[in-house]
Amino acid sequence: MNNLKKFKYLAIGLAALLAPAMCSCDDHGYYDMRSPENMIDDKVPALPEVADMHTYKAPLYWSIYEYMREQGNAGRPADECVFTLDQWIEQLDWMKENLLPYGYDMVCTDGSGTMKALDGSPYMTHHSDLPIKEFVEAAKARGIKVGIYDNPWWIHCDDDVLIPGTQYTVGSLRYDPAIDVVKKPGQKDIWHEIAVPTHPGGREWIDGFFKHYHDLGVSMIRMDFLNWFEDGFSRLEKEWCGPGYGRAVYAQSLAWCAESAKKYGIFLSLVMPNMYNDAELEAKYGNMTRIVGDTWNGTWEFTSSNYRGESWVNWPACRNQFDGFTHWSHIAGKGKVILDGDFTRLNTYANNNEKEFVISIQLMAGGPIAVSDRRSMIGSSLSFYQNKEMLALNADRFVGHPLDDTLNSEGSNIWYGQMSDGSYIVGFFNRDDKPRDMELALATIG
């Protein structure tokens, strides 16, 4: 190899880690993951190409997720789990001082509370009592962008409201057993009122959704519950959550979302996708796609130990971040979809080694960092989010890959990639509870 190439090493683990530059990749008896199967059960229509879809770097931002979850766990009503405008202003001021200087330039809402379309609007104007317009203006005044948790396949307004640019009513987009072929006829959608975008006016409905948020100044849409829309059945809940509108409707609807998001300059974050057929749709039409189940309580369990080494053919394919990044690493890279490891709650981790690990694997994989610690809980964990040496990977749009994307293989613990200046970054990740040796021959990576 070229002796002029520069290398930097990250040694990350729960315990001390040695990294001599020689090759050793014994399997330790770990078992391989199962690749996703082709789960398409209906014909997918001819779909558009969306040029220059993957031009973004992974976002660095703060999410209200932890606050919502902990308020809900404490028994608060859903509308009290959402920040008021005054609470958001306090958070934005804290962001401006503590995270914005390090590249975290966005905040994002999440899924608790009531989504309201007021004053005849077809689309959400208020999140519980939070006026989105004023919220975005307050953020913009501080140099901070806003992401909104919403989905163009959800209905928040009255049925008699007209779809923008058409004479169709929003109610005409609802499931119609006379024309919609679904997986479980008669099953109602839970939690959300669903629009079926393949009905007449559906394309205009989706385009109007993204125009609405563009006009408000929103930068990202976090689009959730994709697997419930496509399949109707949840493997985790072990129950039907909706009729399941099928692969063809999902594919066409997602393609339209991508077209409109690109048209209006909105970053499209896909959440809870099945990723069937090797993520052929999500990798094509999402700027970013989730590769692991929900953060929930955080901790090392979410990052590494939960169902370690196991994978499934539908959402979620993996139940911990490290496996998710490994499993889906082959679809990521510069000019490709961004892998999303969900929210980070550093205050839930047991020690500094764990905190270093969770930040490092996300940045090594080219993923975002979505800080979710509350101001009252973040404490000394803040410094791990402010690590300029690690954040340089994000600024450079670095995307690394494991030596081996087989779950629990020795090679899956060694990640590497190149910076734009030609230097190599190598990360050694120890997922075990005791020190261990890792070795790498530099010729292996270039």
Regions found by a protein language model. Give the residues of each.
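Acidic (Asp/Glu)-rich catalytic clusters
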Residues: 50-55, 96-101, 137-141, 214
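Bacterial N-terminal signal peptides
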Residues: 11-21
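Alpha-helical scaffolding within the catalytic cores
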Residues: 41-50, 90-95, 129-133, 204-209, ...
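Aromatic- and carboxylate-enriched substrate-binding clefts and catalytic-loop regions
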Residues: 106-341
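Bacterial N-terminal signal peptides that target proteins for export
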Residues: 2-11
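Active-site-proximal substrate-binding groove within the catalytic cores of carbohydrate-active enzymes
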Residues: 57-63, 258-446
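Bacterial Sec-dependent N-terminal signal peptides
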Residues: 20-44
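N-terminal carbohydrate-binding/catalytic regions of secreted carbohydrate-active enzymes
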Residues: 59-132
